[in-house]
C-alpha cells in the first residue's frame, strides 16, 4: 500500500476514535447521551441513572453502532418508556465538562456551543462558546436540600467561572502538553486528565472512574490561545501562542502568593510559541516550538487585601528555613523541562520603603542555598535585573537588553524543531494512548531525558505504537530539542514579566523562522513588522493573563511607548487599569477565589460542615509580619478569604519528590553566613574604581563559556549588554555617576536592614548572577513629557510619575 493511501486510511480510523458531537435525550428514569465521530461512522451510547437523589450512576454501552442501529435503539427506548412520557430530546452538545455535587443532587456540565480557535498539525482547537448545567436526578426524586439557599448559592458561585472566556480544548490533540512532549516517546503514567493544566480534572473524576476511556469528556485548558497567519518573503506560515495556567495553587492576586508546601507557586503559567510553515494542503511540513514559564517567587510570602491601602505590605514567613518548598518547586521544573533552569528575576533593587527588596534578597538566599547542593551543570542560573528602574532611564532600550538576556538563555536551552512526515499530519497525528503521558505526580512532562544518540542531527524519533508497521510510518526528523527552560518573575508575574517574555519570544521567533528555512538570519529587528505582529499577540496574552489573576488588563507602558502612543494617553490608561485592579482585588477577588476552589474541587461542601463563605482567610495566617511595626493597624482592612490549599482536600496524585538535576539535592544542615548590619560599606573611591572597570570592553555574553559563569557565579552587563566579572555583590547596590539611584535617601543599608528580621540560619551572602546596565537617570522625564501632560491635574501627574506608582 502506498504511503498516501495508508495516511488516508489512518485518518479515517483516527476520526472514528474521537466522539465530537453529542445529542442528549431524557426519560423519567434516565439520561441518554448519543455520541458520534467526525466521519459519522461510529455511534456510541452513554446512560445516566436519574432515580438517585444524591448519586449519579453512569453506564457505557460498549457497542459501536451505525447510524441506523443507533436510531433503532432510541426508538425502542422511547417505546419502552411511553407510559411515563417517552424519550425526549434535551439538547445538542459537544462534550461533557464534568459532574459536580454540592449538598443535594449531582449536576452535569456540558458544552452546547463551540468556536474554532485554530489548528495544530491538522488538529482543531476549540474554545467554549456556551455551556449548560443540567440537574441529573428527576424532579420527582429531589429532596428539599436541592432547593435550599445554600445549594442555590453554591450553584451561582460555580456559574461565576465563565467557561466561555479563555478555556480551550481539542478532541484529537493533547493541548495540555507541549508539542515536544506530544512528539516524544511515550512513558507509562496517569491519564492526561491529571495534567497540572487540565482544569476539569476534578469534575471528570467520576465519569473517568466509570468508563473505559475519555471519549465522552473534553480536557479543558485555561489560559490563552491565539493563532495567526503571517508571511515573510512571500512564504506563508502560522504562529501560535499558547499559555496554560496551572490548576495547582490557582487563584487571584492577593489571595494566592508565593509557594505552598508542595512547591507549587501562584500564577504558574507555561507559554508555548509554535511556528510551522503552511504547505499546500494546509498542514505543516516543518514545525518548531519554544516553551517558557512564569510563576510567583517561590517563597512563603503574602499580602493582606486592603480597601484602604492600594499597595499592601509584603509579609515574608520564616516557616521554611531550609527552603524545602522552593527546592520542591525547582525539582518539579527540572522534571518537566530538564536543565538548565534559568531564573530571570525582574523585581526592584531599591525602594524608599523595603517591599520587593525583601523578597529579592531572600530569593537570592534561597537560590544560593539550593545551588550548594547541586553540581555545576545542574545549578540554577539566576539573572537579577531591575526592569522598573531601567525602564525609567533616558536612552535605555529595555527590549534590546532583554533580548540579549534571551539570547543567553536560548543558547543554553535551544528550541524544538522537527520535520513531520505526511503520516503525522491531520487527525492521524496523535495516535497515542491517553494514559501514557503523565508523571506519577500528575504533572505533565515536556522533557524526555535524551539518549546518547539524541544529540545527533537528523535524529529519527518514533511514536510509541503497538504496530511495527505504524512505527515505520510515524517517523519524524528531530534536529533540535529544547532542554531546560527560562523562568521569569516579577512581583505579580504580569506586567514586567510579560515584557520580558515578549523579548524572549522575539529572539526565539527569529531562530524558529531560520530553522524552518523561512529567513536567512536568526535575528529579527525590533522595527521589523514581524516584531510588531508578535508584540501585539504578546500584549493580548498579557492582558488576558492579567485579567485572570490581577483583575485588570496588563500595564503595557513599554509596548505603548514602542508604538509611539501619546504619553499622556498611556499614563491615563495605566492609571485607570491600576484603579480597576485595585477594585477587583479589594471587592471581587474573595468570591472569585471561592468559585475557583469549588470548580477545582479544593473545597467540597458538606451538610455538617461550615459553608465556604463562613470560612476565613485563604492565605498563610501565620506569616511573619516583617513590616507590621511600620504600618498602622488602621491601614489594613481584613477581607474574608477562602481556604488555602494546605487545608483543602488533597488532590488525587501526591507530589513526587525528585532531584533538580542528575545528582539531586544534598541536605545542608550547617549554618551559612550572610549579610548583616556589619557588612562593609563600599566607599566612593571603590565605587569609582568599579565604574571605571566597566568601561573596558569585555567579551560579549554569548562568547563567555558556561564554566566561567558557574565558576564566578555572578555576571553583569554594561549598557551595551556586554559581560564583565563582578564577584559576589549586586551591581544594583553600587551608587555611581553611571548607576544612579532612584531615591538618593535610599542607600545600600536599606537593603541590609531588611535582613534584620530574617533568622540567622537563612542569612546567606548573596552570590548571585546580576545583570545591570549603566546609563543616566530620568525619573521625572524631560521637558517634552511635562508639556504633554500639562492638561492633567498636578496631583494625578505626581502620583503617576512617582517611583512607587503601580504600573510596574
From Swiss-Prot:
<dbReference type="Pfam" id="PF02383">
    <property type="entry name" value="Syja_N"/>
</dbReference>
<feature type="compositionally biased region" description="Basic and acidic residues">
    <location>
        <begin position="465"/>
        <end position="476"/>
    </location>
</feature>
<protein>
    <recommendedName>
        <fullName>Phosphoinositide phosphatase SAC2</fullName>
        <ecNumber>3.1.3.-</ecNumber>
    </recommendedName>
</protein>
<comment type="subunit">
    <text>Component of the PI(3,5)P2 regulatory complex at least composed of ATG18, SAC/FIG4, FAB1 and VAC14.</text>
</comment>
<dbReference type="InterPro" id="IPR043573">
    <property type="entry name" value="Fig4-like"/>
</dbReference>
<feature type="domain" description="SAC">
    <location>
        <begin position="158"/>
        <end position="551"/>
    </location>
</feature>
<dbReference type="GO" id="GO:0005774">
    <property type="term" value="C:vacuolar membrane"/>
</dbReference>
<keyword id="KW-0926">Vacuole</keyword>
<dbReference type="GO" id="GO:0046856">
    <property type="term" value="P:phosphatidylinositol dephosphorylation"/>
</dbReference>
<comment type="function">
    <text>The PI(3,5)P2 regulatory complex regulates both the synthesis and turnover of phosphatidylinositol 3,5-bisphosphate (PtdIns(3,5)P2).</text>
</comment>
<feature type="short sequence motif" description="Phosphatase catalytic core">
    <location>
        <begin position="487"/>
        <end position="498"/>
    </location>
</feature>
<feature type="region of interest" description="Disordered">
    <location>
        <begin position="429"/>
        <end position="476"/>
    </location>
</feature>
<keyword id="KW-0472">Membrane</keyword>
<dbReference type="GO" id="GO:0043813">
    <property type="term" value="F:phosphatidylinositol-3,5-bisphosphate 5-phosphatase activity"/>
</dbReference>
<dbReference type="InterPro" id="IPR002013">
    <property type="entry name" value="SAC_dom"/>
</dbReference>
<keyword id="KW-0378">Hydrolase</keyword>
Amino acid at each position: 500500500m502506498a504511503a498516501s493511501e495508508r495516511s488516508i486510511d489512518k485518518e479515517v480510523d483516527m476520526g472514528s476514535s474521537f466522539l465530537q458531537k453529542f445529542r442528549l435525550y431524557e426519560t423519567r428514569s434516565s439520561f441518554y447521551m448519543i455520541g458520534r465521530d467526525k466521519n459519522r461512522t461510529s455511534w456510541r451510547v452513554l446512560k445516566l441513572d436519574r432515580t438517585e437523589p444524591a448519586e449519579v450512576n453512569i453506564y457505557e454501552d460498549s457497542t459501536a453502532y451505525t447510524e441506523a442501529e443507533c436510531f433503532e435503539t432510541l426508538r425502542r427506548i422511547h417505546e419502552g418508556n411511553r407510559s411515563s412520557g417517552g424519550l425526549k430530546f434535551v439538547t445538542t452538545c459537544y462534550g461533557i465538562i464534568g459532574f459536580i455535587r454540592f449538598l443535594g443532587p449531582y449536576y452535569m456540565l456540558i458544552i452546547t456551543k463551540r468556536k474554532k480557535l485554530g489548528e495544530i498539525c491538522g488538529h482543531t482547537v476549540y474554545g467554549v462558546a456556551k455551556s449548560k448545567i443540567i440537574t441529573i436526578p428527576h424532579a420527582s426524586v429531589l429532596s428539599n436540600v436541592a432547593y435550599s439557599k445554600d445549594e442555590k448559592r453554591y450553584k451561582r458561585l460555580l456559574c461565576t467561572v465563565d467557561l466561555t472566556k479563555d478555556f480551550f480544548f481539542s478532541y484529537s490533540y493533547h493541548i495540555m502538553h507541549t508539542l515536544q512532549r506530544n512528539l516524544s516517546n511515550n512513558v507509562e503514567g496517569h491519564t492526561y486528565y491529571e495534567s497540572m493544566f487540565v482544569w476539569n480534572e476534578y469534575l471528570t473524576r467520576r465519569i473517568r472512574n466509570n468508563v473505559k476511556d475519555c471519549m465522552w469528556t473534553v480536557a479543558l485548558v485555561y489560559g490563552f490561545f491565539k493563532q495567526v497567519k503571517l508571511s515573510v518573503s512571500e512564504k506563508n506560515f502560522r504562529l501560535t501562542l499558547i499559555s496554560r495556567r496551572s490548576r495547582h495553587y490557582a487563584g487571584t492576586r492577593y489571595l494566592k502568593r508565593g509557594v505552598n508546601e508542595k512547591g507549587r507557586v501562584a500564577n504558574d503559567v507555561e507559554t508555548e510559541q509554535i511556528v510551522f510553515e503552511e504547505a499546500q494542503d494546509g498542514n505543516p511540513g516543518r514545525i518548531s516550538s519554544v516553551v517558557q514559564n512564569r510563576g510567583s517567587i517561590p517563597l512563603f510570602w503574602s499580602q493582606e487585601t486592603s480597601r484602604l491601602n492600594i499597595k499592601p505590605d509584603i509579609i515574608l514567613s520564616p516557616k521554611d528555613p531550609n527552603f524545602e518548598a522552593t527546592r520542591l518547586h525547582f525539582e518539579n521544573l527540572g522534571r518537566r523541562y530538564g536543565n538548565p533552569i534559568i531564573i530571570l528575576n525582574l523585581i526592584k533593587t531599591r525602594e524608599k520603603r523595603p517591599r520587593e527588596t525583601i523578597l529579592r534578597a531572600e530569593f537570592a538566599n534561597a537560590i544560593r542555598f539550593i545551588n550548594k547542593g547541586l553540581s555545576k551543570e545542574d545549578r540554577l542560573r539566576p539573572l537579577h535585573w531591575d526592569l522598573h528602574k531601567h525602564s525609567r532611564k533616558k536612552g535605555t532600550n529595555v527590549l534590546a537588553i532583554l533580548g540579549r538576556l534571551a539570547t543567553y538563555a536560548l543558547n543554553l536551552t535551544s528550541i524544538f524543531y522537527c520535520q513531520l512526515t505526511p503520516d503525522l499530519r491531520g487527525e492521524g497525528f496523535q495516535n497515542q494512548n491517553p494514559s501514557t503521558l503523565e508523571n506519577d505526580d500528575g504533572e505533565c512532562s515536556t522533557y524526555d531525558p535524551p539518549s546518547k544518540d539524541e544529540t545527533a542531527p537528523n535524529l529519527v524519533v518514533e511514536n510509541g505504537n503497538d504496530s511495527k508497521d505504524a512505527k515505520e510510518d510515524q517517523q519524524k526528523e528531530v534536529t533540535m530539542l529544547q532542554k531546560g527552560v527560562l523562568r521569569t518573575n516579577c512581583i505579580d508575574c504580569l506586567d514586567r514579566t510579560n515584557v520580558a517574555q515578549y523579548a524572549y519570544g522575539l529572539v526565539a521567533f527569529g531562530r524558529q523562522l531560520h530553522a524552518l528555512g523561512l529567513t536567512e538570519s536568526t535575528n529579527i529587528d525590533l522595527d521589523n513588522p514581524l516584531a510588531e505582529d508578535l508584540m501585539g499577540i504578546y500584549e493580548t496574552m498579557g492582558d488576558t493573563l492579567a485579567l485572570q489573576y490581577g483583575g485588570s488588563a496588563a500595564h503595557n507602558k513599554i509596548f505603548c511607548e514602542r508604538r509611539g502612543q501619546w504619553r499622556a494617553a498611556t499614563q491615563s490608561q495605566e492609571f485607570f487599569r491600576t484603579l480597576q485592579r485595585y477594585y477587583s482585588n479589594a471587592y471581587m477577588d474573595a468570591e472569585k477565589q471561592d468559585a475557583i476552589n469549588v470548580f477545582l474541587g479544593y473545597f467540597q461542601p458538606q451538610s455538617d460542615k461550615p459553608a465556604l463563605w463562613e470560612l476565613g482567610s485563604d492565605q498563610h495566617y501565620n506569616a511573619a509580619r516583617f513590616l507590621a511595626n511600620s504600618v498602622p493597624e488602621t491601614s489594613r482592612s481584613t477581607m474574608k478569604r477562602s481556604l488555602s490549599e494546605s487545608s483543602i482536600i488533597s488532590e488525587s496524585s501526591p507530589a513526587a519528590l525528585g532531584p533538580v538535576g542528575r545528582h539531586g539535592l544534598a541536605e545542608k544542615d550547617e549554618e551559612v553566613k550572610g549579610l548583616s548590619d556589619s557588612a562593609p560599606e563600599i566607599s566612593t573611591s571603590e565605587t569609582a574604581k568599579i565604574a571605571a572597570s566597566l568601561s573596558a570592553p569585555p567579551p560579549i555574553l554569548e562568547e563567555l563559556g558556561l564554566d566561567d559563569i558557574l565558576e564566578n557565579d555572578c555576571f553583569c552587563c554594561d549598557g551595551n549588554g556586554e559581560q564583565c566579572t563582578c564577584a559576589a555583590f549586586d551591581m544594583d547596590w553600587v551608587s555611581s555617576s553611571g548607576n544612579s539611584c532612584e531615591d538618593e535617601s535610599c542607600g545600600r543599608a536599606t537593603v541590609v536592614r531588611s535582613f534584620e528580621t530574617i533568622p540567622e540560619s537563612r542569612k546567606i551572602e548573596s552570590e548571585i548572577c546580576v545583570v545591570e546596565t549603566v546609563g543616566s537617570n530620568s525619573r521625572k522625564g524631560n521637558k517634552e513629557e511635562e508639556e504633554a501632560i500639562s492638561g492633567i491635574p498636578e496631583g494625578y501627574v505626581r502620583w503617576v510619575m512617582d517611583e512607587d506608582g503601580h504600573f510596574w
